[in-house]
Design a protein with these regions (language model features):
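Short, well-ordered alpha-helical microsegments
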Residues: 38, 73-74, 160
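Internal alpha-helical scaffold of NAD(P)-dependent oxidoreductase catalytic cores
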Residues: 41-44, 52, 116-123, 131, ...
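Rossmann-like NAD(P)-binding element
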Residues: 46-48, 52-98
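Rossmann-fold NAD(P)-binding glycine/threonine-rich loop
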Residues: 90-141
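NAD(P)+-binding Rossmann beta1-loop-alpha1 motif at the extreme N-terminus of oxidoreductases
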Residues: 1-44
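Nucleotide donor/acceptor-binding cores
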Residues: 2, 84, 148
Length: 163
């Protein structure tokens, strides 16, 4: 059974957690306010979900989803994510995140910024172009004829296969 660590358990993270548990995976939920604030969500999702800290989710996740406002990416613990596949859902919103010169100039993409912060991880961009409610309502089991597909992007072929 795969364990999915979620660094961020808001709309996208909570939806990904529900879908992962429905597919039989364990999930580790985190947010910036601490595990106590996620106990109700973990209970709602079921026994395969557990509220924890960001570091514990990074250490315990076989696959880790970073789904936080982009301005918070420096808080993502790099060392425990070394050698792991990290799914980046972050989008840059200057009005929320503040100005990030490398992104404003086009010198870097948001995923390149995160990859620079996580140099020993394989970062794959996914889930950043779909409304969280559609992510849930369009979910189908593997092999379903009406299954939706989401684009992903990354430099590591094996990591993209894992996602």
């Amino acid at each position: 059974m795969t364990t999915v660590g979620l660094i961020g358990s808001g709309r996208i993270g909570g939806t990904v957690a529900r879908l992962a548990v429905a597919a039989g995976h364990q999930v580790l939920l985190t947010n910036s306010r601490g595990p106590d604030t996620l106990k109700d969500l973990a209970a709602e999702i079921g026994p395969l979900a557990r509220a924890t800290t960001g570091r514990e989710a990074a250490e315990g996740g076989d696959l880790v989803v970073v789904t936080i406002p982009l301005r918070a990416f420096p808080s993502v613990p790099a060392r425990p994510l070394a050698g792991k596949v990290v799914i980046d859902t972050c989008n840059y919103h200057p009005q929320r995140d503040g100005q990030i010169p490398e992104l404003d100039s086009g010198a870097l993409t948001s995923s390149e910024l995160i990859q620079r912060h996580l140099p020993e991880s394989a970062v794959v961009k996914a889930f950043n172009n779909i409304y969280y409610r559609h992510l849930a309502s369009l979910a189908r089991p593997s092999g379903a004829a009406d299954r939706s597909y989401l684009p992903i992007a990354g430099d590591d072929a094996a990591a993209k296969v894992a996602v």
